[in-house]
């Protein structure tokens, strides 16, 4: 698939040079918006705006949304005011908000200047919500019904207004004060008799979120309940917007990427790897590397403290890397398992005792198994024929058991503490590592 995509990109590049615009249009309209956006991102030259003008209006808007920030910025700089207005008018309101949030001030002014009055007002209202909240990712383009409307009236409203809505599969029922009282689907409306009123077929037990709820919690609800859209209400239960499945998927991807970067001791980045400069990557990585280097000094201090003991049985020092490494791996296993469970809502801080008890039993089993394997290895290969071999083998193996127990308990407990006090548990995965703590 990637080879085919590269071939298409090169074909388009050649056709663009030869100014065969009709052929270009015929090729582009057969592609999906995401694939077209990928081609635009690979081209990245002054002719990109010219290629964009070839696209039909609706396809152009769908493609524009899929592009990265740099490509969008390049296109906007090449647009006339009229062209910019046409693109903005075709975008859903949440996509306009995303665009405004990512662009520099001079570009934002152009975008808002070309937007109509209602769009500007809505964008400004959505921008007031905190970053990473449900309000910041919701859209205000949805179908609203009244409980006294009939199925026939509802379907007529959907036909009349649905073309400008982001989704029409789920309709939201509100009272005269805009309070959310129920939901119904287009399927239910179509399968009902024309004279049946909405209040008879709507579902009243509505799952919704508040505008200030964290976006990660919102995205997780999509996973738990298989929603296509989720209503967003204010503190008085008034419907103010909805979050759609495409935005929830974006949030899950962003959060997963951020967690992976934090667990690898890298500060999160908004740009794709290939579009991030060397200095940009350096700035993201060096702070945590400095922290981890300093935390490693604790290990050195402990070893120095027991230098005299190690000098008397010098062979013990050769097993330190194995013990600390195994302890670090054991702690990492526990940390990852607990962090994942916390992220999925499977455990909370109130489950700490149960989690610690489970990890303690796991650590005993793992510790005894590894210690037994290690003892056999020491007796056969490492200490065979040496003085005090049995004593050294027992000391190393028992130390290994204790290290694994301590590492797993600390590795499972720290993420829960961090989650309780509002700190991202992923930060503790590397600062300091369970390996350092187990030492």
List where the protein language model places each region:
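Acidic-residue sensor for enzyme active/binding pockets
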Residues: 255, 359, 435
């Amino acid at each position: 698939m990637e080879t085919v995509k590269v071939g298409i990109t090169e074909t388009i590049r050649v056709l663009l040079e030869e100014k065969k615009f009709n052929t270009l249009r015929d090729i582009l309209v057969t592609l999906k918006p995401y694939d077209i956006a990928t081609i635009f991102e690979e081209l990245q030259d002054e002719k990109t705006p010219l290629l964009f003008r070839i696209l039909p209006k609706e396809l152009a808007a769908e493609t524009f949304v899929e592009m990265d920030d740099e490509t969008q910025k390049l296109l906007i700089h090449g647009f006339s005011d009229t062209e910019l207005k046409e693109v903005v008018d075709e975008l859903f309101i949440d996509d306009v908000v995303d665009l405004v949030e990512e662009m520099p001030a001079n570009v934002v002014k152009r975008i808002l200047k070309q937007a109509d009055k209602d769009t500007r007002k809505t964008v400004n209202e959505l921008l007031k919500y905190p970053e990473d909240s449900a309000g910041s990712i919701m859209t205000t383009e949805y179908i609203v019904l009244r409980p006294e409307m009939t199925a026939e009236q509802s379907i007529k409203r959907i036909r009349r207004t649905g073309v400008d809505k982001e989704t029409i599969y789920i309709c939201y029922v509100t009272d005269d004060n805009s309070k959310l009282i129920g939901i119904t689907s287009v399927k239910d409306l179509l399968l009902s008799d024309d004279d049946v009123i909405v209040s008879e077929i709507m579902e009243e037990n509505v799952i919704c979120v508040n505008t200030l709820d964290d976006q990660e919690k919102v995205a997780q609800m999509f996973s738990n309940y298989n929603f296509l859209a989720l209503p967003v209400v204010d503190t008085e239960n008034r419907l103010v917007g909805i979050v759609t499945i495409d935005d929830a998927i974006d949030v899950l991807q962003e959060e997963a990427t951020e967690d992976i970067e934090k667990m690898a001791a890298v500060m999160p980045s908004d740009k794709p790897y290939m579009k991030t400069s060397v200095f940009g990557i350096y700035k993201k990585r060096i702070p945590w590397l400095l922290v981890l280097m300093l935390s490693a000094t604790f290990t050195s201090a402990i070893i120095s403290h027991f230098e005299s003991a190690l000098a008397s049985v010098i062979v013990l020092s050769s097993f330190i890397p194995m013990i600390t490494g195994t302890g670090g791996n054991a702690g990492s296993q526990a940390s990852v398992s607990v962090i994942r469970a916390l992220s999925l809502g499977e455990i909370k801080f109130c489950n700490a005792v149960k989690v610690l008890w489970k990890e303690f039993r796991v650590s005993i089993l793992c510790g005894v198994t590894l210690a037994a394997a290690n003892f056999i290895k020491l007796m056969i290969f490492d200490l065979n024929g040496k003085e005090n071999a049995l004593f050294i083998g027992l000391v190393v193996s028992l130390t290994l058991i204790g290290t694994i127990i301590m590492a797993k308990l600390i590795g499972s407990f720290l993420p829960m503490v961090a989650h309780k006090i509002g700190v991202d548990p992923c930060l503790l995965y590397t600062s300091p590592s369970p390996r350092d703590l187990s030492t």
